[in-house]
Curated annotation (Swiss-Prot):
Organism of origin: Solibacter usitatus (strain Ellin6076)
This protein's name: ATP synthase subunit beta
GO cellular component, one term: proton-transporting ATP synthase complex
Keyword Transport carried by entry: yes
Reaction it catalyzes: ATP + H2O + 4 H(+)(in) = ADP + phosphate + 5 H(+)(out)
Subunit structure comment from the entry: F-type ATPases have 2 components, CF(1) - the catalytic core - and CF(0) - the membrane proton channel. CF(1) has five subunits: alpha(3), beta(3), gamma(1), delta(1), epsilon(1). CF(0) has three main subunits: a(1), b(2) and c(9-12). The alpha and beta chains form an alternating ring which encloses part of the gamma chain. CF(1) is attached to CF(0) by a central stalk formed by the gamma and epsilon chains, while a peripheral stalk is formed by the delta and b chains.
Cellular compartment(s): Cell inner membrane
Keyword Cell cycle annotated: no
Principal cellular location given in the protein's record: membrane
Amino acid sequence: MVTTNVVTGKVVVVSGPAVDCEFPEGQIPPVHTAIRIISEGFDIPTPIDIICEVQQHIGEGRVRTIALQPTEGLVRGMQAISLGHPVEVPVGPETLGRVLNVIGEPVDEMGPVNAKKHYPIHRPAPSFEDQSTRLEMFETGIKVIDLIEPYLRGGKIGLFGGAGVGKTVIIQELINNLAMKHGGVSVFAGVGERTREGNDLWLEFQESGVIDPHDYTKSKCALIYGQMTEPPGARLRVGLTGLTVAEYFRDEEHQDVLLFIDNIFRFTQAGSEVSALLGRMPSAVGYQPNLATEMGELQERITSTKNGSITSVQAIYVPADDYTDPAPATAFAHLDATTNLSRDIAALGIYPAVDPLASTSRILDPHIVGEDHYATAQMVKGTLQRYKDLQDIIAILGIDELSDEDKLTVARARKVQKFLSQPFHVAEQFTGFKGKYVKLADSIKGFREIVEGKHDGVPEQAFYMQGTIEDVLEKAEAMKKA
């Protein structure tokens, strides 16, 4: 029974992030209700004021909650106040340029977020009649993505890769390109990743002008963090907080929003920890039995409506590079495009280290992207696939044993491979190359000319870390003079 009055109970069991609270019978708060626990009347060095979320009703007036903030210093008998609604977070333009935590509190020491509206983090997905079925490509300015696995506006994109192959750098470049070229709003949800990365991202965005913490009208991105040091409850719910902030811009301001989740695997990992704390029987590989349901509740809210869209780019860590692991495999089912990052390509020094043969897109279709784009992408993939097939022969017999036609294919494939590299704006200080945004038409033109043999006389090295084909020809001229 839900009452409108404030219901007060007390803490009866504390076992790490799982906290059991007792309430009067008949006034038990429903599942997903926010519970505030305070240390008023207790003589402890640091006062406690934390938020938990109801997960289970365990009988005799008791509920099991999961803490969204650290539980150090929590003592049995402390006051537990039911807030009567789920966790609510500030939404609106006032969140831009700010760093918020899972419960919407600012963690950037820039004062309170004076938002006019608050939304609950648990909300239903848009209904069938509200959803849009329009298929339209979203230009990113990154050659390999735009040509081989074009992103769908309002779609879900997975960035797959093991540790350290460049998922976060691609996300940073996408935010930069969206803000600089499209003037759009982004929401970045840092789910269980390194605190240092979160801090670096915030500082980089200030330097590049993506955000101004002192003036939200000049900011293009809201940052929502639940980092590795946070309790599992925070890491499980911070994705929903980020999504709720993005939903405001889609539904109320009718914008096309980019939602970045780094890393969706940590969301699953946190769910597994919470599941164990709640005493559920583990499923395959020790994951939670409700893995697909949890993932669905998050993913189904990320969609296009007739008012606006949320295009989501999700970094997906692949444990031990095993794509059959239940966590990445469950995420696969929801995606419209996949950008697959390969350690082998990174080892060649080609960045972004995207594997063009393993990456896919639902909209790489001549009816959606056009005949020219589709044909060029297939020619590029065909050339790279032939090169891959010939690599065993080259390794055993050497390149001289190939036919003239195959030698030409290999030469063009190596140029294509080098041309797939691209200098990023956000990596300028590491690479020394000036960042380049490449329009789709320039990408198609450049790759088509390479596979058709127009640049067979240009040295391979001239194609490395360049933007357009004109940049390549300029580099080749400079190499000749040197």
